[in-house]
């Protein structure tokens, strides 16, 4: 990491020429300006597509081998990591330990700013030791400006433990170097409010995390077509979604879909396999396990045998 005391040259700290009269704009002009500037996030994702694709492959393979995915950040970056990690269990029925978000300052920092805690390199290293990171794991360090000591400490400690490391930042490599196996640069330019990286930098970071986690889960077979077939049926909304998925992918009515869902132990993926192959829950579960939980692979295997 570059030893930076002066950060004014960083892309995320620079003055945006398009918003220099920000305090004089009408409400409509403010909305139009935000809309125009946010278009940069799409270009930034496109510019990093190769690195994002490589990261998906690395993460999915690590999770397939029993490893874990950790997001590490401070402030907005940390909160976004925690948010994405928290959404994985209900969306993909993953165990809570599979994808974890780590924020400088811990849970309290989610609701109250703790920016001073991001300056401690040793705290980042310590959290990696506490989570007992192994070579099977992937650690994603998120730092918009690329300089957060907490994140650099975590990445360095993870590398020492031979874990795969991924860095996500919003500054060019010429301004800040980051030691990581995969270096994702999301260049959205100066913020409308100078230095406020909760804006474009935060938006593009969330987009990238959406891509990484969803992409990895797709490759793990937790999606069939574009349906979340591993959805955790934990409330009325998700129960309704589970029924609609079964109905849409079979010829069953809602009552029949409900009966099938219950017989499968409320596992949509298993219910679909049971219906397609005419097998019971135990047989279906065994077949899914044989194919590492991949419904399409299990179905194709059964069809090849017929």
UniProtKB/Swiss-Prot annotation:
Any Pfam family hit: GKRP-like_C
GO biological process: amino sugar catabolic process; N-acetylmuramic acid catabolic process; peptidoglycan turnover
Secretion signal, residue range per the UniProt entry: none
UniProt gene name: murQ
Purpose of the protein: Specifically catalyzes the cleavage of the D-lactyl ether substituent of MurNAc 6-phosphate, producing GlcNAc 6-phosphate and D-lactate.
Domain SIS span(s) in chain numbering: 59-222
Catalytic EC class: lyase
Domain of life: Bacteria
Keyword Transit peptide: no
Subunit structure: Homodimer.
Record-annotated active site: 87 (proton donor), 118
Record GO terms (molecular function): carbohydrate derivative binding; carbon-oxygen lyase activity; ether hydrolase activity
Family: Belongs to the GCKR-like family. MurNAc-6-P etherase subfamily.
Catalytic reaction equation(s): N-acetyl-D-muramate 6-phosphate + H2O = N-acetyl-D-glucosamine 6-phosphate + (R)-lactate
EC number: 4.2.1.126
Protein name: N-acetylmuramic acid 6-phosphate etherase
Note: A lyase-type mechanism (elimination/hydration) is suggested for the cleavage of the lactyl ether bond of MurNAc 6-phosphate, with the formation of an alpha,beta-unsaturated aldehyde intermediate with (E)-stereochemistry, followed by the syn addition of water to give product.
Coiled coil: none
């Amino acid at each position: 990491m570059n030893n930076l005391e002066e950060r004014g040259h960083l892309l995320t700290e620079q003055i945006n020429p398009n918003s220099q009269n920000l305090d004089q704009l009408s409400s409509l002009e403010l909305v139009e300006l935000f809309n125009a500037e946010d278009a940069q996030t799409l270009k930034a994702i496109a510019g990093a597509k190769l690195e994002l694709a490589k990261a998906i492959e690395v993460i999915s393979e690590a999770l397939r081998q029993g490893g874990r995915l950790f997001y590490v950040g401070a402030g907005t970056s940390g909160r976004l990591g925690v948010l994405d990690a928290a959404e994985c269990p209900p969306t993909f029925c993953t165990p809570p330990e599979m994808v974890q978000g780590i924020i400088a300052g811990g849970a309290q920092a989610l609701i109250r700013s703790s920016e001073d805690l991001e300056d401690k390199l040793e705290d980042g290293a310590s959290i990696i030791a506490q989570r007992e990171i192994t070579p099977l794991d992937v650690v994603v360090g998120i730092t918009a400006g690329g300089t957060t000591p907490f994140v650099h400490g975590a990445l360095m400690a993870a590398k020492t433990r031979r874990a795969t490391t991924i860095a996500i930042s919003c500054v060019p490599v010429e301004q800040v170097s980051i030691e990581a196996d995969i270096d994702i640069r999301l260049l959205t330019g100066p913020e409308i409010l100078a230095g406020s990286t909760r804006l474009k930098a935060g938006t593009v970071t969330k987009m990238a995390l959406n891509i990484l986690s969803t992409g990895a889960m797709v490759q793990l077979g937790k999606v069939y077509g574009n349906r979340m077939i591993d959805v955790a049926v934990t409330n009325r909304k998700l129960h309704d979604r589970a029924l609609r998925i079964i109905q849409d992918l079979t010829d069953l009515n809602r009552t029949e879909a409900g009966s099938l869902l219950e017989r499968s132990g409320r596992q949509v993926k298993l219910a679909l396999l049971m219906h397609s192959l005419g097998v019971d829950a135990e047989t279906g579960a065994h077949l899914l396990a044989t194919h590492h939980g991949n419904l399409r692979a299990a179905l194709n295997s059964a069809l090849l045998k017929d």
